[in-house]
A protein has these predicted regions:
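RNA/tRNA-interacting regions in translation and RNA-turnover enzymes
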Residues: 1-188
Length: 188
């Protein structure tokens, strides 16, 4: 065959769709797809972890283990972690209250309020990084939370403050048999 009809998901360029990709008339025959779509080359490592190693279920966690293994072989590697000095635990200027119903199950809940965010498509580099680890990009806000989750291993969630009833977030376990709407808009 001299060609192929495919969707963006079949060549790692987007979420699963029912349609096919139609290239513009200026697409040159023989040009590698990575050049046409400006896809950067990357190496993806698939790592199997045992359930007791949740500390290693992130990019930084894997890097920490890799550093320890290489340093034991004579290397002198150091980790450079981002500064968190601006995220003081003493900052109480949020207008949102947090109530933890079971502190034995959730001893700490923290949040940051960021204002004047324009929800839009993520930049291409972020979309490609998420797609490379099997996550479909949604928008800049959701994509940043997913990126940080995989970077540091800490689950995040973004809330629209105008949608929080009573300016209060309540952390609790679900009651037996209760249902709720998940982020994919399904009742579970």
């Amino acid at each position: 065959s001299n060609g192929m009809i495919c969707g963006p998901d079949e060549i790692g360029l987007g979420p699963k769709t029912d349609g096919i990709m139609v290239l513009s008339n200026d697409a040159k025959v023989g040009l590698p797809g990575s050049e046409y779509f400006d896809v950067k080359s990357d190496v993806i490592f698939e790592i199997g972890l045992t359930p007791n190693r949740t500390d290693a279920m992130s990019h930084i966690g894997v890097a920490r283990d890799l550093k320890a293994a290489l340093n034991s072989k004579g290397h002198n590697l150091k980790m450079c972690l981002p500064s968190i000095k601006d995220f003081s635990i003493d900052n109480k200027h949020l207008n949102i209250d947090v109530e933890i119903k079971s502190p034995d199950l959730c001893p700490r809940y923290s949040g940051v309020c960021i204002s004047n965010i324009k929800v839009q498509d993520s930049p291409e580099w972020l979309k490609h990084r998420l797609l490379s680890i099997g996550i479909n990009p949604t928008n800049n806000v959701v994509d940043v939370t997913n990126y940080v989750l995989h970077e540091i291993g800490q689950p995040l969630h973004a809330f629209d403050t105008s949608m929080i009833e009573g300016n209060k977030i309540i952390i609790k376990t679900a009651k037996e048999g209760s249902t709720f709407i998940t982020l994919d808009e399904n009742e579970r």
